[in-house]
């Protein structure tokens, strides 16, 4: 029987499942040193956010096969070390969707009707009906930033209020938006000018941090109220203070902040300049804090940990658990498929309507399900809020209106095995393809319609340009000027011979000023930075 250590409290529903299927020890409140001494006896460890599962702890876990995080975030777990040691890390990203969506709506109603402020006034003996006059939701326009699972639930609920619901999400197809019966907005500027309310449900990334800043707030309707139940920092807090101070917007309701006290901290130690504004409603990151969500989390983490221990494909944060016999053969193709998916959103930005994956050669006779899941994981991971993994990636694609098909071609002309992806976006066809050379050497042989022989690396630049002399030399000069080293370069003409693409493997990401200078080179059509 597997031995599992439960180091932090989970719901009774989860504990019951664990006790029926494994040997369970519950040791809550152990110090890090105590954990180091005892972890070697266990096959699995279950934690929440307080326990630091660092390199030292993982290396002491001689028998450790699975770490379960009862919740979404995994910042307290050293994923790199876990992956290197073959320890599966699982979490429960889908368990609190409804709770978070409902909390966003609760905050929306609170900021509209001044409920916390009126409560505070009334319990202190005041009766100020006219002072706390609110506004209705009915007939007003609300924009949802981020139409993933939580955003979609919010959209469904808000339609019942009789609101005009819009959505901003560049990575959601028009078909998906239409199915929800709402309107798609194509720019943040349009969002700010049209919205009476905004509710944010985006992932936190370089692209979304500060997505609403001073510039955007200055464009807003003066009656705008903003709700953020997603991640701290998506709304620039300094700019939000200025907007409230200057009367650019009517209010805000926030459940998340850039700097939050550690979980379990007592009241009185949270500070923010936003707390001084009467038209701001705040809560201490309560989005997932419901009985139902915690029961869901407990049940989900118990099932995930047990499934992982039994060798099944699970909701793995770091690596998929592959329950197949010949992992040595198919593993390079799994990584290749994920790379092909990553290349699309690194080089293109449009929403996807459909994806067709074709397998050619011997690989077509393998378990191709793992290959399509890997491709979709690479495709969606950079742009969705939810944790993307083998378990949920098909659902995430379906929720975004992406039609996915597979086909098999038993023979291939030039390669013993080939994985080809055809992506349709706004009626336009974009293709990528790759193969494996030797035992495990991946090669991209089709990059957005250009035939090429490219060994993918962590940092790359894809520069499409007119086929004319001097372009390559100028690009090299600019990169040298900014101390960026070119490790390899591949150049290919398109089939008509009019344009070319150069793909450079470089030793670092480039700064915005470098990219801007490259884009100004005569003949350069596009310049995309790719990080794999």
Task: Briefly describe each language-model feature range.
Residues 89-90, 223, 229-348, 368, ...:
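Rossmann-like dinucleotide-binding domain for NAD(H)/NADP(H)
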Residues 150:
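Hydrophobic/small residue at the entry helix of a nucleotide-binding pocket
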Residues 1-42:
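N-terminal glycine-/charge-rich "phosphate-binding" loop or analogous flexible N-terminal tail
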Residues 51-58, 172-271, 289:
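Rossmann-like adenosine-cofactor binding region
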Residues 85, 93-141, 145, 153-161:
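Phosphate-binding beta-alpha-beta segment of Rossmann-like dinucleotide-binding domains, i.e.
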Residues 8, 44-119:
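Phosphate/diphosphate ligand-binding glycine-rich loop within oxidoreductases
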Residues 321-532:
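A conserved regulatory-domain signal marking ACT and ACT-like small-molecule sensing domains
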Residues 101-120, 140, 159-163, 243, ...:
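Oxidoreductase and adenylate-handling cofactor-binding alpha/beta cores
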């Amino acid at each position: 029987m597997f031995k599992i250590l439960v180091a932090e409290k989970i719901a009774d529903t989860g504990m019951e499942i664990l006790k029926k299927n494994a040997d369970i020890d519950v040791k809550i409140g152990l110090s890090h040193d105590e954990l180091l001494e005892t972890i070697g006896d266990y096959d699995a460890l279950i934690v929440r956010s307080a326990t630091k599962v660092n390199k030292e702890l993982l290396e002491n876990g001689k028998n450790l096969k699975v770490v379960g995080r009862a919740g979404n975030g995994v910042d307290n777990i050293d994923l790199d070390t876990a992956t290197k040691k073959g320890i599966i890390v699982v979490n429960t990203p889908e368990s609190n969707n409804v709770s978070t969506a409902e909390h966003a709506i609760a905050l929306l109603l609170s900021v509209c009707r001044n409920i916390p402020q009126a409560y505070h006034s009334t319990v202190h003996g005041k009766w100020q009906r006219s002072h706390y006059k609110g506004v209705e939701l009915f007939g007003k326009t609300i924009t949802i930033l981020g139409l993933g699972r939580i955003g979609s639930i919010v959209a469904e609920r808000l339609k019942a209020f009789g609101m005009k619901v819009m959505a901003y999400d560049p990575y959601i197809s028009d078909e998906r938006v239409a199915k929800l019966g709402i309107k798609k907005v194509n720019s943040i500027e349009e969002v700010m000018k049209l919205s009476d309310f905004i509710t944010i449900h985006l992932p936190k990334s370089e692209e979304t941090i500060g997505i609403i800043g001073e510039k955007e707030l200055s464009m807003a309707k003066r009656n705008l109220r903003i709700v953020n139940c997603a991640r701290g920092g998506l709304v620039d807090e300094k700019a939000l203070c200025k907007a409230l101070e200057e009367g650019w917007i009517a209010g805000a309701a926030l459940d998340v902040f850039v700097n939050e006290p550690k979980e379990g901290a007592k009241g009185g130690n949270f500070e923010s300049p936003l707390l001084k504004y009467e038209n701001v409603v705040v809560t201490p990151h309560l989005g997932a804090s419901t009985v139902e969500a915690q029961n869901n989390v407990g049940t989900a983490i118990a099932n995930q940990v047990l499934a992982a221990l039994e060798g099944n494909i699970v909701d793995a944060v770091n690596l998929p658990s592959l329950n197949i016999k010949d992992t040595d053969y198919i593993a390079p193709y799994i990584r290749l498929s994920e790379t092909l998916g990553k290349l699309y959103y690194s080089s293109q930005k449009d929403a996807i309507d459909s994806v067709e994956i074709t397998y050619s050669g011997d690989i077509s006779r393998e378990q191709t399900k793992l290959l399509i899941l890997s491709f979709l994981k690479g495709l969606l991971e950079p742009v969705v809020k939810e944790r993307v993994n083998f378990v949920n990636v098909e659902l995430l694609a379906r929720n975004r209106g992406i039609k996915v098909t597979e086909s098999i071609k038993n023979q291939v002309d030039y390669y013993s095995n080939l994985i080809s992806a055809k992506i349709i976006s706004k009626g336009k066809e974009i293709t990528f393809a790759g193969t494996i050379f030797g035992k495990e050497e991946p090669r991209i042989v089709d990059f957005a319609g250009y035939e090429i022989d490219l060994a993918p690396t962590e940092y790359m630049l894809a520069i499409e340009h007119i086929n004319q002399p001097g372009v390559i030399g100028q690009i090299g000069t600019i990169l040298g000027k900014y101390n960026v080293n070119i490790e390899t370069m591949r150049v290919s003409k398109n089939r008509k011979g009019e344009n070319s693409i150069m793909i450079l493997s470089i030793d670092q990401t480039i700064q915005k000023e470098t990219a801007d200078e490259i884009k100004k080179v005569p003949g350069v059509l596009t310049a995309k930075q790719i990080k794999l």
